[in-house]
């Protein structure tokens, strides 16, 4: 269930590609469990997400891989809880959520927000200007970011929110340039994000500012398919915190990239969310085989026993939170549309969706993943 049309369709199409690649590999393996995908497109419409979820669940389909935005996920969770189905949610998100009817294969906030704060505070600066799409992802991500940055002695000097799909940034960019933060923390999504990157780079150029070095833009969402959408000489020098980049140098990723490119020559290229969708289907197939049924509770119990060598490295589902152990990384975008990996964790990091082990709000010393420098 991916919105392959609408304001964030580029990312959603890469997610669908990742899922379909895993379905294809499942069919080719000819194992005891054969998955037959049914693809639906909510087009970014929340009401449509709910209607399609009810339609699928009402037809007896208990396992659904999908949703990108947090608003869509929250819209459909009550449907899955009512019908006792499982939603496999394959995207990074803001955390602070738990449901017996959701398996989270994307990054939790301690796996993407906190590593980014550590990197920025230690290497870029302490004054942030936050801009985001006006919905829960940006609200919560900015809240976590502000809390973590403040704990490091930094500050958020301003926050601005725009409607999803909004592409008018003159006032926001003027405010950024007037206040000259050390960096911009970007939580815009889809077409809004692409327009912002282009407009901000152009405005800085007019003022003689080297945007990538003087006021870098950092985010937890920017991915390879989106760099292609930004275009216009504005794709290089941006920082992204992610558990996967397609430039990872490893045999599992090389095989994944080759197979993905052959399967989807027209794109979009692979991304962290595409990989998370691939992981979700792989874990679903293994869990169905172990459970011997598609009932939600046995499948949920079975997924905690699975281990997967994914393109990013080892992945497993935490049996307490049903979020994934993943490997945090920091990347910097290059003009070739790829990311140079600057830092990465040495091993998968346990999910901490409520930041119980990571947040100063709980009177615990902040502990974000320790990342090592990656040699070029």
Set out the residue ranges of the language-model regions.
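Extracytoplasmic "Venus flytrap"
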Residues: 1-17, 40-44, 269-273
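Extracellular/periplasmic periplasmic-binding protein-like sensory domains
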Residues: 200-276
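Beta-alpha junction/loop-to-helix N-cap segments that form part of ligand/metal-binding clefts
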Residues: 14-15, 29-95
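Solvent-exposed, acidic/polar segments of extracytosolic/periplasmic ligand-binding ectodomains
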Residues: 311-376
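Periplasmic-binding protein-like
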Residues: 56-70, 89-90, 129-130, 180-196, ...
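An alpha-beta-alpha
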Residues: 105-161
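Short beta-strand segments enriched in small/hydrophobic residues
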Residues: 1-14, 23, 68, 127-131
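Short beta-strand elements in bilobed, periplasmic/extracellular small-molecule ligand-binding domains
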Residues: 28-44, 99-101, 150-166
């Amino acid at each position: 269930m991916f919105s392959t049309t609408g304001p964030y369709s580029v990312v959603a199409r890469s997610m669908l590609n990742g899922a379909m690649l895993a379905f294809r590999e499942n069919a080719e393996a000819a194992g005891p469990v054969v998955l037959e995908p049914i693809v639906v497109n909510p087009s970014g419409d929340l009401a449509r997400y709910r209607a399609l979820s009810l339609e699928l669940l009402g037809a007896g389909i208990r396992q659904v891989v999908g949703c990108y935005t947090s608003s869509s996920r929250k819209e459909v969770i009550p449907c899955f809880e009512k019908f006792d189905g499982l939603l496999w949610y394959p995207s990074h998100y803001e955390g602070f959520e738990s449901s017996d009817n959701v398996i989270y294969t994307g990054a939790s906030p301690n796996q993407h927000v906190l590593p980014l704060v550590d990197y920025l505070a230690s290497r870029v600066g302490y004054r942030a200007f936050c801009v985001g799409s006006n919905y829960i992802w940006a609200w919560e991500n900015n809240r976590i970011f502000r809390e973590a940055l403040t704990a490091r002695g930094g500050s958020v000097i301003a926050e601005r929110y725009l409607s999803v799909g909004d592409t008018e940034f003159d006032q926001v960019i003027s405010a950024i340039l007037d206040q000259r933060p050390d960096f911009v923390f970007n939580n815009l999504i889809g077409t809004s994000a692409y327009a912002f990157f282009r407009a901000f780079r152009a405005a800085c150029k007019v003022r003689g500012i080297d945007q990538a070095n003087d006021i870098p833009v950092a985010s937890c969402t920017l991915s390879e398919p989106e760099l292609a959408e930004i275009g216009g000489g504005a794709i290089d020098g941006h920082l992204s915190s992610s558990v996967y980049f397609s430039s990872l140098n490893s045999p599992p990723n090389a095989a994944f990239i080759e197979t993905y490119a052959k399967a989807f020559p027209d794109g979009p290229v692979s991304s962290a969310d595409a990989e998370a969708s691939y992981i979700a289907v792989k874990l679903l197939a293994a869990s169905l085989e172990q459970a011997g049924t598609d009932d939600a509770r046995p499948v949920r119990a079975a997924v905690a026993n699975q281990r997967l060598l994914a393109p990013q490295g080892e992945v497993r589902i935490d049996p307490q939170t049903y979020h994934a152990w993943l490997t945090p990384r920091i990347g910097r975008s290059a003009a070739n549309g790829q990311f140079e990996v600057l830092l990465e964790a040495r091993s998968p990091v346990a999910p901490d969706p409520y930041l119980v082990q990571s947040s100063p709000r709980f009177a615990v010393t902040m502990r974000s993943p320790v990342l090592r420098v990656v040699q070029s």
